[in-house]
Regions:
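Active-site PLP attachment segment
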Residues: 1-18
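Proline-rich low-complexity regions
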Residues: 5-6, 21-22, 128
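A generic, residue-level signal for flexible/boundary positions that often mark functional hotspots
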Residues: 3-4, 49, 78
């Protein structure tokens, strides 16, 4: 895929390296030049192409079916503890509402933070916006039944714990180096570079 790489790129010319920017060079006939923001990242294209070529047509069909199967397995297994947003089968992701948290004092964010203490990165939360307190779970096609069952048991245990000790969810996560981050402030006032703190006069 080298001939399709966007510019600029670095070429090794024995003793030195050259920055290649000019599209008139023979080895850049297939390049479309600089990669603009909406085109994405070249590394992502390479990974996607590698994934597709390594699986082939039959393999892609199989992994797609596996992703849908895994999602529906989770949906069926979790529906007794969590509240599916819709009835019926789902595709590759399952959407839950926060109805199962009703009258517990725990919100979707608290539940997601508690998952961190259980060793799981939380699922997408509060999206889509049309579902109140949405939890969007997307199991990948590569998860084994054993790992799915472990995930199911963990979520069911968390829901059972809600009934006995909902206060612990407000403090979660407790096993991480940094506890609750203020995501809203981080999004509205991002710190994009490090500044050295002034020395304290003694």
């Amino acid at each position: 895929m080298e001939k399709f790489c966007p510019t600029p790129l670095i070429k090794n010319n024995n003793d030195n390296f050259d920055l290649v920017e000019n599209l008139n060079e023979n080895d850049l006939l297939y390049s479309f030049g600089r990669l603009n923001v909406f085109h994405g990242q070249m590394g992502m294209f390479v990974r996607a192409m590698s994934y597709m070529l390594s699986h082939g047509a039959d393999g892609l069909k199989q992994v797609s079916e596996d992703a849908v199967l895994n999602a529906n397995y989770l949906r069926a297994s979790l529906s007794s503890h969590l509240t599916p947003a819709f009835d019926g089968f789902c595709m590759h992701e399952i959407l839950f509402s926060d109805d199962f948290l009703k009258d517990t004092g725990v919100e979707t964010l608290d539940f997601a933070k508690a998952m961190i203490d259980e060793g799981y990165h939380p699922m997408t939360i509060y999206f889509p916006l049309v579902i109140h307190g949405a939890l969007l779970v997307e199991p990948t096609e590569t998860e084994s039944k054993q790992s799915l069952d472990h995930f199911i048991n963990t979520l069911c245990d968390l829901v059972e714990r809600l009934k006995k000790d909902s206060d612990s969810f407000k403090a979660a996560p407790v096993f991480t180096p940094i506890r609750r981050l203020d995501e809203t402030q981080a999004a509205r006032k991002p710190v994009l570079r490090w500044k050295e703190e002034p020395l304290i006069a003694v």
